[in-house]
UniProtKB/Swiss-Prot annotation:
HAMAP family: NaMN_adenylyltr. The keyword Ion transport does not apply. The lineage of its organism: Bacteria, Pseudomonadati, Chlorobiota, Chlorobiia, Chlorobiales. This is Probable nicotinate-nucleotide adenylyltransferase. Gene3D superfamilies: HUPs. Disulfide bonds: none annotated. Pfam families: CTP_transf_like (PF01467). Catalyzes the reversible adenylation of nicotinate mononucleotide (NaMN) to nicotinic acid adenine dinucleotide (NaAD). It catalyses: nicotinate beta-D-ribonucleotide + ATP + H(+) = deamido-NAD(+) + diphosphate. It comes from Chloroherpeton thalassium (strain ATCC 35110 / GB-78).
Length: 199
């Protein structure tokens, strides 16, 4: 069966941690495509960079990833909708486009831990197989598997020391941050003075 992996997020900004997740997903599951869907998360509030720059940086990320194989694409469907994004609506959208494909929903352990707070999470489990990325050594799988049948998720452990929130702080404080992302994204951030007013 055709597989399509979906990464939802603000990518605010994208960094090499995101790249590692995307390339590992391709290696482990061999999806026909990996969609980077720019989202407005109702549990996290508004993004820091304007939406146009979020989209531009995600496209730069897809271009860099595309150098390793033509698998990656960007969707702005969630951005173009009014209000916050809910994962169930995004999954319904892509399921309608690809009704015969298996959807892989890639999430972090932090979202896995609060999965029961997600809108229509039972339907999410019907529409998609979860791929949960967790830091090595955590016990989150045992803590949260009570609501997710074991056949509906795959637990992947790896170490990702990078985070977008830390990067935004480092940029605002004038620290050395450029090496943590591809040069094209770093150049975009510098040219448009993004995250300069972060506190």
């Amino acid at each position: 069966m055709k597989k399509i992996a979906l990464f939802g997020g603000s990518f605010d900004p994208p960094h090499y941690g995101h790249f590692a997740l995307c390339t590992l997903t391709r290696e482990l599951f061999s999806p026909e495509k990996i969609i980077l869907s720019i989202s407005k998360n109702p549990l996290k509030g508004s993004a820091n960079a304007p939406e146009a720059h979020q989209l531009a940086m995600a496209k730069l990320m897809a271009e860099e990833l595309g150098k390793t194989g033509p698998v990656f694409e960007v969707s702005d469907w969630e951005l173009r909708r009014a209000g916050f994004s809910y994962t169930i609506e995004t999954l319904r959208h892509f399921h309608a486009i690809e009704p015969n494909a298996e959807l892989l929903l890639c999430i972090g352990e932090d979202n896995y831990q609060i999965f029961e707070k997600w809108k229509a999470y039972q339907e999410i489990l019907q529409l998609a197989h979860l791929v949960v990325f967790a830091r090595s050594g955590t016990q989150g799988e045992q803590q949260s598997s009570r609501i997710i049948p074991p056949e509906r998720y795959t637990w992947v452990q790896l170490d990702l020391p990078l985070s977008s929130s830390d990067l935004r702080r480092e940029i605002a404080e004038g620290q050395d941050w450029q090496a943590k992302m591809p040069s094209s994204i770093a150049a975009h951030i510098a040219a448009h003075r993004l995250y300069q007013n972060e506190k």
